């Protein structure tokens, strides 16, 4: 909501784990079609494509920065989301953002150590807007569920994001914390 995406904008999502893939799904339901997914795992990039990423870049097998610049006509993405929790990735995300663009860091929920970047070259010289995301409000859950329902209506395979079978939930030890499973087919 904060970034007010426009038609034709390039939005980059770095990190295609659960957070990045759910974010990709949300951005797609907001009408963004030029989504670039960056990760080092081909399975995750394949899932990103299924969920609506127009482009993917595998930093393990190609120069992802050069590929993103090629995709965006040498400018970079208007918006980049850093979803990895990796200090090394956090130092790279700036290279994907165009002058006057924005970057949202939402991948660090634990202290994974410091990262290195150049405030002059990476932020100030490019006039990048930076925001961190830590938590959410209760109303955000409703909006998130609505976005997932919308994604399902659009034919995006959000159910494939689940990595555990429903039956397995009943077999799990009581002392293990599990994510909440929501069945959108019920309409509630």
PLM-predicted stretches and their roles:
Residues 1-33:
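Short internal alpha-helix immediately C-terminal to a glycine-rich phosphate-binding loop
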Residues 9, 101-102:
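Glycine-centered, small-residue-biased loops immediately flanking beta-strands
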Residues 13-16, 28-92:
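Adenosine-nucleotide cofactor-binding segment
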Residues 41, 109, 136:
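Residues in the short beta-alpha loop(s) of Rossmann-like NAD(P)-binding domains
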Residues 85, 107-108:
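Short glycine-/small-residue-rich Rossmann-like dinucleotide-binding loops
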Residues 91-95, 137-188:
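C-terminal hydrophobic helical "lid"/dimerization subdomain
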Residues 97-99:
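Helix-to-beta-strand junctions that scaffold the AdoMet/dcAdoMet cofactor pocket
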Residues 108-127, 144-146:
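Rossmann-fold NAD(P)-binding glycine/threonine-rich loop
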């Amino acid at each position: 909501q904060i970034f007010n995406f426009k038609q034709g904008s390039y939005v980059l999502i770095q990190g295609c784990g659960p957070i990045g893939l759910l974010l990709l799904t949300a951005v797609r339901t907001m009408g963004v079609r030029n989504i670039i997914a960056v990760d080092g795992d081909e399975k995750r990039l394949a899932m990103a494509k299924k969920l609506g990423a127009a482009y993917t870049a595998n930093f393990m097998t190609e120069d992802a920065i050069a590929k993103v610049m090629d995709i965006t006509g040498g400018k970079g993405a208007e918006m980049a989301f850093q979803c990895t929790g990796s200090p090394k990735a956090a130092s790279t995300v700036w290279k994907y953002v165009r002058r006057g663009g924005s970057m949202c860091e939402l991948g660090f929920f634990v202290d994974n150590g410091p990262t290195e970047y150049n405030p002059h070259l990476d932020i100030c010289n490019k006039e990048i807007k930076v925001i961190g995301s830590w938590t959410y409000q209760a109303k955000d859950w409703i909006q998130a569920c609505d976005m997932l329902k919308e994604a399902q209506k659009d034919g995006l395979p959000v159910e494939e994001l689940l990595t555990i079978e429903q039956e397995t939930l009943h077999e799990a030890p009581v002392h293990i914390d599990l994510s909440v499973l929501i069945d959108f087919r019920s309409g509630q």
